[in-house]
């Protein structure tokens, strides 16, 4: 895990591609016209609260959205990007793994319409997924190929 995930610095939030075998856990955003990307598939995560570190922000968001305790050892890749909502600020994107058992234990919160597993190949090509998240996940795949 990258050390900066435990550091306090100025960032807007964290999004996580949580892999369950060869699939990614995705959440269908609420269909409300006053939110960015309504009725679009996205990844768990959200905005920073107070002086949270990226890891603390991610763990809180995953707990609130999915009822899962995400251990830092689950994180396999991360990178800092420009925020999707404020290009002058930073956001963090992580890739992590959860087990089939953890997936079955999800208690879906009150943000979003539904969650599901989407095959990796579908996620990177699908219409109706936030494009920036697709691009960030592709960066992980490219980096993984280079490392192998």
Q: What residues fall within each predicted segment?
A:
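Short connector loops at helix/strand junctions that flank enzyme active sites
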Residues: 11, 19, 38-43, 87-91
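Short secondary-structure boundary/capping segments
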Residues: 8, 16-17, 32-33, 83-84, ...
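Nudix hydrolase/Nudix homology domain
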Residues: 34, 38, 108-148
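Conserved Nudix-box catalytic region and its N-terminal flanking loop in Nudix hydrolases
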Residues: 23-64
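A short coil-to-beta-strand element that immediately follows conserved catalytic motifs
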Residues: 69-79
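Acidic, metal-coordinating catalytic segment for phosphate/diphosphate chemistry
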Residues: 1-15
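Active-site-adjacent beta-strand/loop module that shapes the phosphate/pyrophosphate-binding cleft
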Residues: 22, 79-104, 116-122, 136-144
